[in-house]
Amino acid sequence: MALMLVLFFLAAVLPPSLLQDNSQENSLEKLSTSKKSVQEEIVSKHNQLRRKVSPSGSDLLNMEWNYDAQVNAQQRADKCTFSHSPIELRTTNLKCGENLFMSSYLVPWSSVIQGWYNESKGLIFGVGPKQNVSVVGHHTQVVWKSNLQVACGVAECPENPLRYFYVCRYCPVLNYSGHYPSRPYLAYTARAPCASCPDRCEDGLCTKSCQYKDMSFWCKRLEYVCKHPGLKKRCLATCQC
């Protein structure tokens, strides 16, 4: 149970030797997630790693940027509070998961994300950590099959020895049963890439599926449903996907 308490919302402080590459070439402004190029780097790195999971996965989604989650991820980073935020502060139109990272020096986003992914070395897929002390929650968050969107923020916290604080949000939040994931070490289905989505596959990842659900069977039958505010609330999939 102690292991489960720390599994999915973990904060990382990775060794300098792992992440020192090119750190001197970065400035806080260059890492700002308000920049389109930085957003693209973060999304691209996540999708690159999701394509290379081992064993291969049949149902991992191709991730996109979430602008609303970017705002609250940056707000959390700016607070310089090295702890996970409550779920209500990680909610936009979706509830979102969270990875944290702190460093005494600036680290490229791609290296931060790679560091999270590299926790796979301590994980036996479908079973759990190789040792009780192995941290694998960041990796699981990065490769969780139903991650549809990602957004991040970074801030400088001068009063903290680990003065650079990175926050990433993953939407929707992991599939929970009570307080913990029902199958925490099965982040995806181990089959050939896109085997679960042959009609909507892009370079080994499943393309966007609808994040909403219709509440009534008649939603797709009524032409005017999306023009009526009350009906639209019951037909979110029809009206927004």
From Swiss-Prot:
Q: Which GO terms describe its cellular component?
A: extracellular region; transport vesicle
Q: Does the keyword Signal apply?
A: yes
Provide the disulphide bond pattern.
C194-C201, C197-C206, C210-C241, C219-C235, C226-C239
One Pfam match? CAP
Tissue pattern of expression reads: Expressed in submandibular gland.
Q: How does it assemble?
A: Interacts with A1BG. Interacts with KNG1 isoform LMW.
Which residue ranges does the record assign to the ShKT domain? 210-241
Q: Where is the signal peptide?
A: 1-19
What protein family is recorded? Belongs to the CRISP family.
Induction field: By androgens.
Q: What does this protein do?
A: This protein is supposed to help spermatozoa undergo functional maturation while they move from the testis to the ductus deferens.
Known PROSITE patterns for this protein? CRISP_1, CRISP_2, SHKT
- Where would I find the SCP domain in this sequence? 44-170
Q: Which residues are glycosylated?
A: N118, N132, N175
Q: Which UniProt keywords apply?
A: Cytoplasmic vesicle, Disulfide bond, Glycoprotein, Signal
| InterPro entries with a match to the protein in the record | Allrgn_V5/Tpx1_CS (IPR018244), CAP_dom (IPR014044), CAP_sf (IPR035940), Crisp-like_dom (IPR042076), CRISP-related (IPR001283), Cysteine_rich_secretory (IPR013871), ShKT_dom (IPR003582)
| The protein's name in its UniProt record | Cysteine-rich secretory protein 3
Q: Where in the cell is it found?
A: Cytoplasmic vesicle, Secretory vesicle
